[in-house]
Amino acid sequence: MAAGGKSFLADAGYGEQELDANSALMELDKGLRSGKLGEQCEAVVRFPRLFQKYPFPILINSAFLKLADVFRVGNNFLRLCVLKVTQQSEKHLEKILNVDEFVKRVFSVIHSNDPVARAITLRMLGSMASIIPERKNAHHSIRQSLDSHDNVEVEAAIFAAANFSAQSKDFAAGICNKISEMIQGLATPVDLKLKLIPILQHMHHDASLASSSRQLLQQLVTSYPSTKMVIVTLHTFTLLAASSLVDIPKQVQLLLQYLKNDPRKAVKRLAIQDLKLLANKIPHTWSRENIQALCESALHTPYDSLKLGMLSVLSTLSGTIAIKQYFSSAPGTAATTARSFDLVKLAQECCYHNNRGIAAHGVRILTNISASCQEKDLLPLEQDAVFGLESLLVLCSQDDSPGAQATLKITLTCMVKLVKCRPHLSQSVVESLLTQLHSAQDAARILMCHCLAAIAMQLPVLADGMLGDLMELYKVIGRSTTDKKQELLVSLATVIFVSSQKALSPEIKTVIKQQLENASNGWTAYRIARQASRMGNHDMARELYQSLLTQVASEHFYFWLNSLKEFSHAEQCLTGLQEDNYSSALSCIAEALKSYHKGIASLTAASTPLNPLSFQCGFVKLRIDLLQAFSQLICTCNSLKTSPPPAIATTIAMTSGNDLQRCGRISNQMKLSMEEFRNLAVRYGDLYQSSFDADSATLRNVELQQQSCLLISHAIEALILDPESANFQEYSSNGAAHVESEYERRMMSVFNHVLEEVESLNRKYAPVSYLHTACLCSAVIALLKVPLSFQRYFFQKLQSTSIKLALSPSPRNPAEPIAVQNNQQLALKVEGVVQHGSKPGLFRKIQSVCLNVSSVLQSKSGQDYKIPIDNMTNEMEQRVEPHNDYFSTQFLLNFVILDTHNITVESSVIDSNGIVWKTGPKTTIFVKSLEDPYSQQVRLQQQQGQPPSQQQQQRTAYSRF
């Protein structure tokens, strides 16, 4: 997680980066002061970019005040530009420090004679509702403008009223009656009523307000039966119910009633849309009767478009707790079989419908029922689901239209889900996929390959059977000329790598390389090499990286590819390990380390300030240290042969009282080795905690490396250092845990095998014998024989999150200390901005930011003060929740000792699961604690032998107090 640690925008005139921000603001200010309208508009519309680049309050406050001035004195077009900027920069509004001044300048335009100017001002106030929710003058202006005779102004007032109602309970309660009168008033035009009704969705601040709004909406639905009025009223009704969480079952019943009884298609469509919203948001409130009513409507409707909508709602519900409620035995229905339920009948009927969308929802419902309901009478539905999925697969794989591809995605997702929870169905599913692969369109083939890879990951037993078909297809695709060909080559290669569980045969390598030479570009070859590294096929990966070295234009890319080639070569060296040949194991590890050291040098050269490759470097350095620790452990085990315990070792152990002495010098070496593995486990834990943006597979990979270190340290302790107190219960693996990848499956298998061997030896033999050292060496070789997987985060970052910190006060020069008197406290303000990439919160989201402030005395003071240790350092921690990606807090720090103090502010992130991630950044400033003038004067007088005056004595006593 990259982060900018430099302090900027703290105090006026401080910091180099702030000068950049100030110069940018001055440049825009020059444009605002221009006499040309075009230049003024250009300056205004460039403000959002400025806010994005410098998102701290001091600049944003200055910028918004300048914009408010333009709004006050400019023409309506400029005001409109300022309004657009304000709406685009909504999340920065709360950083305005002088809210009163900003509002005052904007609000002055509300008294204009121009109704358009007033309308723009009302929209401006509405856009600022989040920072001025309780401003009474704004409330009054909105009420007044609702009575205006100018339509533009009234519409603007409606916009502002909706925004203020969402933010302010008082405004919502006060405006509710006014809105009610206007809606029911005969003088209000219908189009205005349609705009007023949606305001009622915000009347959810308390139960009584929600109830009165609901009654009004109920009256409107019955009083105004026109299509537009019913649609707007029903939708507002739904949004109010979803926000207030009151009367949701009643709302579901009302919508179902309109769906069943109202003949208008538009109303039915709206009812379906709102039912879908409620099914997504609150599925647990749906009763069995509600689902039954929806099933009946779907069974009886003659219109495919409506049936599709209803099935969409039912398929959403089928993936939630609502499906269990539906199948739970109702009174008097104990003997009902699964196939007699209307939902099942509907799904079976729709599975083979001529409309692809309807068929997709039908099979999705059957899949969800099979996955979530384990009752015996529901088991026959599995086969129905498989047949439905296979028929859809045949239909959609021949069609490359976007609709067919969307349906195919649903079908393949259902297949993976069904195979995961019903493994006995996997054989037929895989066979149907392989059969269709040959005749399918290329776009469909890519999706089908992804599906096959997902199934093979879950059920490796099926993988070997796929290889023949896949290799045939790979040869065929080489002759294809479609634009999807490159993507298909990558997808197929991935499935082949997953299917080849141990190592690629020479024939497979030859076919893949031949097709790449004939038909692919460099990027395709790189992607295939990346997948090979991920699946542990390092020999293939090394050859592909080698072939790409001469095809890149940038030296950074060259060094990156060269490092990947060296890492692949290093891991390939480890595949030659043999179980009982420990000397060859040492030479293999030495060869691997040689390549790893070359690779880390290239990797360091590939890094840039913007892309420091910190995770990659950290992961590889740990791998190097782990290999060295394994090598050292094998050497230590071998030393039992070259340097066995002396004959008097038992006597020495008895006289010294240290039982380990009877093992000779190997005991001390083993102790050092155990500590080394524990330190490596801690370092892997640190790498895990610093990888906030990593995907779950990468994190699991790091976790497995950490567990292998802990396993070896535990084995050393249990076999040699402390066999008496060895506890095997806490290390036993959880068999029920779901394994996501072949690499994890093989590592877990090794862990279990090693633990069993260690436990068996621990019970049978006393330490230390050749059996014990052989067991440790075998454990090391077993771990190294599992090919390392380089997961996605090593190659690409899908989620990017960074934190920028700004401290105030901050010095002009980072090396200069801030002066503080020792009898005062320093108020340190810490502000921060969370910056995201293109996919924020893809893997995990920031719940809060933990700020840790600590101060350390740089050198001891010359004077010998007897001060408690608590006053010498500051250690504080605060948790703050970012709002619109901004957070701010303050710390009060004491500096009693006269000297230079080093203050460190470190931020870490807490995600929505409460896990702490050590993401940084870490910022440091210096504070020089100075003696206050009065104490200095008293001390000097005492040194000169002059008694202080009475008044001075009183002040001294007071200051001491």
From Swiss-Prot:
Biased composition (Low complexity): 937-955
InterPro entries: ARM-like, ARM-type_fold, INTS7, INTS7_C, INTS7_HB, INTS7_N
Function of the protein: Component of the integrator complex, a multiprotein complex that terminates RNA polymerase II (Pol II) transcription in the promoter-proximal region of genes.
DNA damage among keywords: yes
Subunit structure: Component of the Integrator complex, composed of core subunits INTS1, INTS2, INTS3, INTS4, INTS5, INTS6, INTS7, INTS8, INTS9/RC74, INTS10, INTS11/CPSF3L, INTS12, INTS13, INTS14 and INTS15. The core complex associates with protein phosphatase 2A subunits PPP2CA and PPP2R1A, to form the Integrator-PP2A (INTAC) complex.
Localization, UniProt: Nucleus; Chromosome; Cytoplasm
Domain of life: Eukaryota
Origin species: Gallus gallus (Chicken)
Stored Pfam families: INTS7_C (PF22965), INTS7_HB (PF24437), INTS7_N (PF24436)
Any coiled-coil regions, as ranges: none
Key words of the record: Chromosome, Cytoplasm, DNA damage, Nucleus
Protein name (database record): Integrator complex subunit 7
Listed SUPFAM superfamilies: ARM repeat
Annotated segments matching region Disordered: 937-961
Biological-process GO terms, alphabetical: DNA damage response; RNA polymerase II transcription initiation surveillance; snRNA 3'-end processing
Family: Belongs to the Integrator subunit 7 family.
A GO term from the CC aspect: integrator complex
